[in-house]
Swiss-Prot record:
Xref: PANTHER family: ATP-DEPENDENT CLP PROTEASE PROTEOLYTIC SUBUNIT
Organism, as annotated: Bacillus licheniformis (strain ATCC 14580 / DSM 13 / JCM 2505 / CCUG 7422 / NBRC 12200 / NCIMB 9375 / NCTC 10341 / NRRL NRS-1264 / Gibson 46)
Function: Cleaves peptides in various proteins in a process that requires ATP hydrolysis. Has a chymotrypsin-like activity. Plays a major role in the degradation of misfolded proteins.
Single biological process term from Gene Ontology: protein quality control for misfolded or incompletely synthesized proteins
Record's catalysed reaction(s): Hydrolysis of proteins to small peptides in the presence of ATP and magnesium. alpha-casein is the usual test substrate. In the absence of ATP, only oligopeptides shorter than five residues are hydrolyzed (such as succinyl-Leu-Tyr-|-NHMec, and Leu-Tyr-Leu-|-Tyr-Trp, in which cleavage of the -Tyr-|-Leu- and -Tyr-|-Trp bonds also occurs)
Subcellular location: Cytoplasm
GO cellular component, one term: cytoplasm
Keyword Cell membrane annotated: no
Name this polypeptide is given: ATP-dependent Clp protease proteolytic subunit 2
Catalytic residues (UniProt): S98, H123
Gene responsible for this protein: clpP2
Amino acid sequence: MNTIPYVIEKTAAGERSYDIFSRLLKDRIIMIGSEFNDDLANRVTAQLLFLSAEDNEKDISIYINSPGGSTSAGYAILDTMDYVKPDVRTICVGMAASMGAILLAGGAKGKRYALKNSEIMIHQPLGGVKGQATDMEISAKRIIKLREKIERFFHERTGQPIEKLKADMERDYFMDADEAKAYGVIDAVL
């Protein structure tokens, strides 16, 4: 059972209780602490749009602790990060793997961070398909196209050569925070 902590805020008007995530949102902090799926994407996208509408000059921070997940859900968040006017800072706490690493690298240049004991992992997209040969061929082409898209993204965000990215992403490629900084996924270790 997941228990969500509540905090109590005292004001001149009295006390008000918030679940911790709502309280963090008041400080323009969004938490991603699970696998990427459509529910997470809808929640985070709505939070980004809300914070941008509330103040389109003030940075938004996204803290990431995720094993990865759905690329379509992750790209919905990434596209919204690029769409909103405020800079979006990304901070890895724990792990940013797969789609989590893409989102981490997708933060505003100069504002991508990881805590010192964080772990970052990149790899080629995963997929499984059943069905007729034609369906499997369509799915394989889609995954290859997605892999090339991810390689281009990391090339643009890290400066790593495409050939190095192809080789590194052939299997799970793990980095600690300092290695992720040297690789160009993040800008600083906190």
